[in-house]
């Protein structure tokens, strides 16, 4: 028998989400009692096992803030300049700090126009007025409404209450409430400005109790880089990013691996590498903290059709997870998630968390443009391998950067729209609720037990049809089962 026939006879069978279900198990576990927190790197523990994709129609700073507040993690895409991406990371970090250390300030002799420019640029409503490192006033948007052309010192509030570096959250909140102020400068022993506490940050800390934060009280954030963009990784690391996500269509590329090893040594942030779909890749990526699994499962990806390469996602997750376990690496399943039940299946197959694109692209916080089609609201969504994304700068992800002219790009993705789905909070509520329900059915109290107790059954096409609503005309659309996909 020829070797080519042997290839076919020895080929493994690959399964994806629609090919499997989990078998119900005896349980005492109630969905409301399960713990959905998960570790995705040695230093990053999430309160929900969900990351937003590093795509230019999915994750910029607003999505990253929303994800972190709900207990997940946003990965800011790299289809922008280094300076822009660094600023995006900083905006996430500034969103909820207890004490903001890199305070944006202004001198008393500056114009009101410049004060407005700074506020709009950095997304803030007020500025400490500083002279020789000492606070001499506070200027806010309320102070300068319709008063262009004047100087800061003419309109600033001069009587400024300050606090020492030793102040705690409750004390700061009490001072601000008693004095009816929303900004509290922090000064050192010499009276020099070293930080700023804002009422909005304190309120957010109490409102978003499930948020993931570092020891400074800052929201966690990740950012994507090319394996060959060392400067970008270093600048993001300096900006305080918590996780560097090396973002390439095929991470098991030997040139990329050499570059990633060098990058790993020069950044202190935790390090995730993707994407892969072959357990052999794990052997060469042991320098990473986690690997990201998925070659072509995304709704906007055409890699499997254009290149003929990929592994159905459930099988890819399982194969990679088995190998990753040997090295103590974490696994993130990236792509192909259509319903909350798919998240349950991905984790049961070995993933520690999932990355979502399509399901989050239609949210208010996603950067895609809103469009109206036949009276219904949609948001633009495109693959990073689509022609539009490649023209903007994403070609390198598919090893088509530099030498290829725009008209010669070979896209591995498409562009389109998805239905508007409301806020990130609303979408995640349904997804996490479905995950908790699935854990209850299999008797899993936490993510670890879901991996251990989840048993699969392979289903037929008839089984899949039976799994969905059938023999009915649906008149009221459920929030977790959209009629239009």
UniProtKB/Swiss-Prot annotation:
Residue numbers binding IMP: 299, 334-336, 357-358, 381-385, 412
Job description of the protein: Catalyzes the conversion of inosine 5'-phosphate (IMP) to xanthosine 5'-phosphate (XMP), the first committed and rate-limiting step in the de novo synthesis of guanine nucleotides, and therefore plays an important role in the regulation of cell growth.
Positions of K(+) binding: 296, 298, 301, 466-468
EC number: 1.1.1.205
Stated family: Belongs to the IMPDH/GMPR family.
Cysteines paired by S-S bonds: none
Subunit structure: Homotetramer.
Catalytic activity: IMP + NAD(+) + H2O = XMP + NADH + H(+)
Residue ranges of every copy of the CBS domain listed in the record: 99-154, 156-212
UniProt protein name: Inosine-5'-monophosphate dehydrogenase
Domain of life from the UniProt record: Archaea
Signal sequence, renumbered to the chain: none
Pathway: Purine metabolism; XMP biosynthesis via de novo pathway; XMP from IMP: step 1/1
HAMAP family, per the entry: IMPDH
Organism this protein belongs to: Pyrococcus furiosus (strain ATCC 43587 / DSM 3638 / JCM 8422 / Vc1)
Annotated PROSITE patterns: CBS, IMP_DH_GMP_RED
Keywords from the named record: CBS domain, GMP biosynthesis, Metal-binding, NAD, Oxidoreductase, Potassium, Purine biosynthesis, Repeat
Enzyme type, top EC level: oxidoreductase
Catalytic site: 301 (thioimidate intermediate), 397 (proton acceptor)
InterPro entries, per database record: Aldolase_TIM, CBS_dom, CBS_dom_sf, IMP_DH, IMP_DH/GMP_Rdtase_CS, IMP_DH_GMPRt
Regulation: Mycophenolic acid (MPA) is a non-competitive inhibitor that prevents formation of the closed enzyme conformation by binding to the same site as the amobile flap. In contrast, mizoribine monophosphate (MZP) is a competitive inhibitor that induces the closed conformation. MPA is a potent inhibitor of mammalian IMPDHs but a poor inhibitor of the bacterial enzymes. MZP is a more potent inhibitor of bacterial IMPDH.
Lineage: Archaea, Methanobacteriati, Methanobacteriota, Thermococci, Thermococcales
Gene Ontology biological process terms from the UniProt entry: GMP biosynthetic process; GTP biosynthetic process
Binding-site positions, NAD(+): 247, 294-296
MF term (GO), any: nucleotide binding
Cofactor annotation: K(+)
Gene3D superfamilies: Aldolase class I
């Amino acid at each position: 028998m020829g070797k080519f026939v042997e290839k076919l006879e020895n080929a493994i069978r690959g399964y994806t989400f629609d090919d499997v279900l989990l078998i119900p198990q005896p349980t005492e576990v109630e969905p409301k009692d399960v713990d959905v927190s998960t570790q995705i790197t040695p230093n990053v523990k999430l309160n929900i096992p969900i990351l937003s994709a590093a795509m230019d129609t999915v994750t910029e700073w607003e999505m990253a803030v929303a994800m972190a507040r709900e207990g997940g993690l946003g990965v800011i895409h790299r289809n922008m300049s280094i300076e822009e991406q660094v600023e995006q990371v900083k905006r996430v970090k500034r969103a909820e700090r207890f004490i903001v250390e890199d305070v944006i300030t202004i001198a008393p002799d500056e114009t009101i126009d410049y004060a407005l420019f700074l506020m709009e640029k950095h997304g803030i409503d007020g500025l400490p007025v500083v002279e020789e490192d000492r606070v001499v006033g506070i200027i806010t948007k309320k102070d300068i409404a319709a008063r262009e052309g004047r100087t800061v010192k003419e309109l600033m509030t001069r009587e400024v209450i300050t606090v020492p570096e030793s102040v705690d959250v409750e004390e700061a909140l009490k001072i601000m409430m008693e004095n009816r102020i929303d900004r509290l400068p922090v000064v050192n022993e010499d009276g020099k400005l070293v930080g700023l506490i804002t009422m909005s940050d304190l309120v957010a800390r109490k409102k978003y109790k499930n948020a993931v934060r570092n020891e400074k009280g800052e929201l966690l954030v990740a950012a994507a880089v090319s394996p060959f963009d060392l400067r970008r990784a270093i600048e993001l690391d300096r900006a305080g990013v918590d996780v560097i996500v090396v973002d390439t269509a095929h991470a098991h590329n030997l040139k990329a691996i050499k570059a990633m090893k060098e990058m790993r040594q020069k950044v202190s942030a935790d390090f995730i590498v993707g994407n892969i779909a072959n357990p052999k890749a794990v052997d060469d990526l042991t320098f990473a903290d986690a690997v990201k699994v998925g070659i072509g499962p995304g709704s906007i990806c055409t890699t499997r059709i254009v290149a003929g390469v990929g592994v159905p996602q459930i099988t890819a997750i399982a194969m990679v997870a088995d190998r990753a376990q040997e090295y103590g690496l974490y696994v993130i399943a990236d792509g192909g998630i259509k319903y909350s039940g798919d998240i349950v299946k991905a984790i049961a197959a070995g993933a520690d968390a999932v990355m979502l694109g399509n399901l989050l692209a239609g949210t208010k916080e996603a950067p895609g443009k809103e469009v109206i089609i036949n009276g219904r609201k949609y948001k633009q969504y495109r693959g990073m391998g689509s022609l539009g994304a490649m023209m903007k700068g994403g070609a390198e992800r598919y090893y088509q950067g530099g030498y290829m002219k725009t008209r010669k790009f070979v896209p591995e993705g498409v562009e389109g729209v998805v239905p508007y789905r409301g806020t990130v909070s609303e979408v995640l509520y349904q997804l996490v609720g479905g995950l908790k329900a699935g854990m209850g059915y299999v008797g899993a109290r936490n993510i670890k037990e879901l991996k251990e107790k989840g048993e699969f059954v392979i289903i037929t096409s008839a089984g899949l049809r039976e799994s969905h609503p059938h023999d009915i005309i649906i008149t009221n659309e459920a929030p977790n089962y959209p009629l239009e996909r």
